[in-house]
């Protein structure tokens, strides 16, 4: 569990913990990546007590040693944890050599605040030697000390007709989605801070540190005001198709520059692109990805908005889905579906050969017309599609049609 000390000093368990522990028993190396301040360092230090050596590359002395004598960091028989390894990606080659000399489960636990598989200049992926996990900002159930994400696994493994019973039996209780969107999921502002003013100071410090320090680790960016302007513009496009030409026009930057900046934001786990489900049978489909943010609190701060919108509710559901997906052993995809004619399903979960379509509506009273695109999706994909899930902000849990269940978002997330 992730021990986070704050107003309440009891442990805050994280959904990823069982998956991390299990993979350390199987693989020689486990790599935990995610945005800065999601709790990676705290999480892995819990596993270092009395049994692992811990080195962080935030320490300049450790960086100097990594450059001068990497074998000194990775050698020996004691398991090693290397924190913020993206600062010296050449260390991955030393880790590979150490594993090849003596392959042992749990030998290395690495963390990084950038996606090592997307970083330019990283030539070593530890293929066949490492398992990769992503720690996303905390879900609302993690913030409530329940140690998990939403009930996605319950819905995936149950028959459609069992969904009502599953949701009624396990609910974390109602919550104001707007308040959740404002505080986001980074542990410090989400759990330890109680006022909007405190969070605003934290988010501004986070943005400045990212621009002035963390971003420079990935790429030399001199025009920081331009980069921040692009970040702000992206925050206004939550849930929209990624159109780099339009973004470039909005921020008055060349399209290749916008392309580069978006890739850097994605590499840093600040921006999330959701791919399209593009298996077309009878309908022509859009194939561009949709854009979301890794944390709604940060997105609201960067945009200057104070009132969350329906797009922020979608983003909250996506964050919960990502937490669930990235701790699973079985491969799953989070996608969206949109036809050229304008029919759209916000998210499609593809796993085990089946499709779970999800629509998110910021309404307290879902109506039959809100289920129209879910039903269209089911007609298009037949037996491959599960019943549709219509998430809303009210309290009603009911089948609005024989194949679409309307459920409060807080019953699932």
Give the role of each language-model region.
Residues 92-116, 123-125:
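Conserved catalytic/switch belt of AAA+ P-loop NTPases
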Residues 2-5, 190-355:
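Accessory nucleic acid-recognition modules appended to NTPase machines
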Residues 1-21:
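N-terminal pre-Walker A segment at the start of P-loop NTPase domains
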Residues 32:
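Hydrophobic anchor at the beta1->P-loop junction of P-loop NTPases
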Residues 2, 121-236:
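Interdomain motor-coupling "hinge/lid" segment immediately C-terminal to the ATP-binding subdomain
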Residues 159, 393-413:
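Domain-level recognition of nuclease-like catalytic cores that cleave nucleotide substrates
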Residues 40-41:
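Conserved lysine of the Walker
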């Amino acid at each position: 569990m992730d021990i986070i000390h704050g107003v309440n000093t009891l442990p805050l368990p994280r959904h990823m913990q069982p998956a991390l522990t299990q993979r350390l028993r199987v693989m020689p190396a486990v790599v935990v990546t995610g945005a800065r301040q999601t709790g990676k360092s705290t999480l892995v230090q819990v596993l270092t007590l009395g049994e692992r050596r811990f080195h962080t590359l935030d320490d300049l002395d450790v960086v100097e040693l990594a450059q001068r004598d990497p074998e000194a960091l990775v050698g020996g028989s004691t398991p090693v944890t290397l924190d913020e390894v993206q600062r010296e990606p050449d260390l991955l080659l030393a880790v590979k050599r150490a594993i090849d000399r003596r392959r042992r489960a749990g030998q290395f636990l690495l963390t990084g605040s950038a996606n090592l598989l997307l970083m330019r200049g990283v030539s070593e992926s530890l293929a066949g030697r490492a398992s990769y996990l992503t720690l996303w900002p905390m879900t609302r159930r993690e913030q409530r000390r329940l140690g998990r994400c939403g009930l996605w696994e319950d819905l995936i493994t149950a028959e459609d007709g069992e969904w009502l019973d599953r949701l009624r039996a396990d609910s974390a209780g109602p919550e104001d989605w707007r308040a959740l969107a404002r505080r986001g999921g980074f542990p410090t502002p989400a759990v330890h801070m109680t006022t909007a003013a405190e969070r605003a100071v934290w988010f501004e410090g986070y943005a400045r540190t990212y621009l002035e320090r963390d971003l420079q680790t990935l790429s030399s960016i001199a025009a920081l005001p331009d980069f921040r302007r692009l970040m702000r513009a992206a925050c206004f496009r939550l849930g929209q198709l990624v159109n780099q030409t339009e973004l470039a026009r909005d921020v008055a930057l060349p399209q290749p520059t916008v392309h580069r900046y978006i890739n850097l934001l994605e590499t840093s786990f600040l921006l999330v692109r959701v791919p399209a489900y593009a298996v077309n049978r009878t309908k022509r489909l859009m194939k561009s990805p949709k854009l979301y943010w890794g944390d709604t609190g940060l997105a609201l701060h960067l945009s200057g908005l104070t009132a969350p919108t329906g797009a922020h509710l979608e983003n909250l559901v996506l964050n919960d889905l990502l937490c669930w997906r990235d701790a699973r052993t079985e491969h799953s995809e989070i996608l969206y579906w949109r036809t050229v004619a304008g029919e759209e399903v916000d998210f499609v979960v593809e796993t085990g050969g089946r499709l779970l379509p999800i629509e998110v509506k910021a309404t307290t009273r879902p109506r039959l017309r809100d289920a129209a695109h879910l039903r269209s999706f089911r007609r298009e994909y037949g037996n491959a599609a599960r019943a549709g899930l219509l998430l809303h902000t009210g309290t009603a849990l009911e089948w609005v049609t024989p194949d679409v269940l309307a459920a409060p978002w807080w019953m699932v997330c």
